[in-house]
Each structure stands twice: as C-alpha cells, then as structure tokens.
Amino acid sequence: MQIWPAIDLLGGKCVRLQQGDYARETVYSADPAAMAGDFQRQGARYLHLVDLDGARAGRPMNLDAVRAIVAAVDMDCELGGGIRDEATIESLLELGLSRLVLGTSALKRPEWFREMCNK
C-alpha cells in the first residue's frame, strides 16, 4: 500500500480549507519544508503537494515553498494546482518533482493532455 500525505499550500503556508472555502482556512504550519520533513521522519516515502493559490491563478504560485520542500526531503513529491502548459510542466519537473497532477487542463484540453502524456 502507498500512503501519500498531503500538504496544501496557500500563501506559502501549510493549510486546510474547510469544504474548499478559501475564506475558511486553518494554518497548520508556516514552514512547509519542516512539515514535509516531519512526514518523512514518520515514514512517508511520497508527498502530495497542492498549490491552492496556483489552482485559483491558473499558474503555480508557491514555487519557493515547493523548492524548499524538494530540497529538504528525500521523497517522491508530486504537485497539482495551476499546471496548464508545457513550459510549466518542464520547469516543475526540473525542480525535482517526480509527478505532476493535471486536473482542469486535462479535462478542458484532452488532446493536449494526451500529447503531454506521450512525451
């Protein structure tokens, strides 16, 4: 079994939204890299990251936090939120992310999504 703990990023912090409402957030940590390290020390081998600002803006917004997380841990990390074009995909993979999660762009542009999957 694979278990992927998740870190939702909003304004560079680790948060949870109540029922997806950006106005009702709970901040769990102001240091996402430290939280990722805690997950690794507890035995996690994988990490799921969600850029909530990126999901709203249509482009990744928490890149400093993502860079810090990838540098701080020795785990496969995946990211979703605001990934809408090939240049973004390439730059995120260059950061050291193992996987990317595409939702909106995959649904709205299935031909493009197929092309990206076949690269």
Language-model regions, residue ranges each:
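Short secondary-structure transition/capping segments
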Residues: R59-N62, I89-S91, W112-E115
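Conserved anion-binding
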Residues: G12-V15, G20-A23, L93-K119
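Conserved N-terminal beta1-alpha1 strand-loop-helix module at the mouth
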Residues: M1-M75, I83-A87
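Hydrophobic transmembrane alpha-helix bundles
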Residues: L47, D85-E94, N118-K119
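Catalytic beta/alpha-barrel core
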Residues: L47-V50, D76-R84, S98-R109
